[in-house]
Swiss-Prot record:
Belongs to the ribose 5-phosphate isomerase family. GO terms for cellular component: cytosol. One of its GO terms (biological process) is D-ribose metabolic process. Homodimer. GO terms for molecular function: ribose-5-phosphate isomerase activity. It catalyses: aldehydo-D-ribose 5-phosphate = D-ribulose 5-phosphate. The active site is at 107 (proton acceptor). Keywords: Isomerase. Catalyzes the reversible conversion of ribose-5-phosphate to ribulose 5-phosphate. This is Ribose-5-phosphate isomerase A. Substrate binds at residues 32-35, 85-88, 98-101, 125. Its EC number is 5.3.1.6. Pathway: Carbohydrate degradation; pentose phosphate pathway; D-ribose 5-phosphate from D-ribulose 5-phosphate (non-oxidative stage): step 1/1.
Length: 231
């Protein structure tokens, strides 16, 4: 299968999971990116089962609304039974690198309040050790250089994310992103806590303290379900 076909496969599998496990009238948390878009497209047929969705980005909001979903403010929600999102990398503990699409902060906020985090990905995203994919850090613009120096001290190579026009990429929150290359992340939870404590960091794209509960992994032979122990 092509990567696009695998994304469609896991998008449908996630919609099937949500329809089977989430009560009618619930609100669904939805991530950002091409794989999350496949989930939105697949869930659209059953959208009347749900009160609405909480979106992790302006792009996801537009996609949801194009299918007729009501998009709700997270501040209006008492509970969020499930959050579905893709990953740039995921390891065998359920820790992830996310933020390739630039929505890491809102993704982390929505994931943090969800009861179940369902990661949807193709098999190429499952890795033994995180770090081959550059690690995004959302930063307040005035702290970009100082955070870059801290990244270098860790052994990473900081690269300011730019648009195709060559200007800094700006997140939905008005911040910039540093992509860190060259890290081998053997202890993602500790690194997440460490980087998040740097002045000027909004959040780092490590999802380890609140990782995935299960992963629907697309392979050439179908969808594998991986459940992660949080004990």
């Amino acid at each position: 299968m092509t990567q696009d076909e695998l994304k469609q496969l896991v998008g449908q599998a996630a919609a099937d999971y949500v329809n089977a496990n989430v009560p009618e009238g619930s609100v669904i948390g939805v991530g950002t990116g091409s794989t999350a878009n496949c989930f939105i497209d697949a869930l659209a047929a059953g959208k009347t089962r749900y009160r609405g969705a909480v979106s992790s980005s302006l792009a996801t909001t537009a996609r949801l609304q194009s299918h007729g979903f009501k998009v709700l403010d997270l501040n209006e929600i008492d509970s969020l039974p499930v959050y579905v999102d893709g990953a740039d990398e995921i390891d065998h503990s359920g820790a992830m690198i996310k933020g390739g699409g630039g929505a890491l902060t809102r993704e982390k906020i929505v994931a943090s309040v969800s009861d179940v985090f369902v990661c949807i990905a193709d098999a190429s995203k499952l890795v033994e050790t995180l770090g081959s994919f550059p690690l995004p850090i959302e930063v307040v613009p005035m702290a970009r250089t100082s955070i870059g120096r801290r990244v270098t001290a860790l052994g990473g190579v900081p690269v300011v994310r730019v648009t195709k026009e060559g200007v800094p990429f700006i997140t939905d929150n008005g911040n910039e992103i540093i992509d860190v290359k060259g890290l081998r992340i053997s202890d993602p939870r500790t690194l997440e806590t460490h980087v998040n404590a740097w002045p000027g960091v909004v959040t780092v794209g490590l999802f380890a303290s609140r990782g995935a509960d299960l992963c629907l992994l697309g392979t050439d032979t179908g969808v594998d379900t991986i459940r992660f122990s949080k004990g």
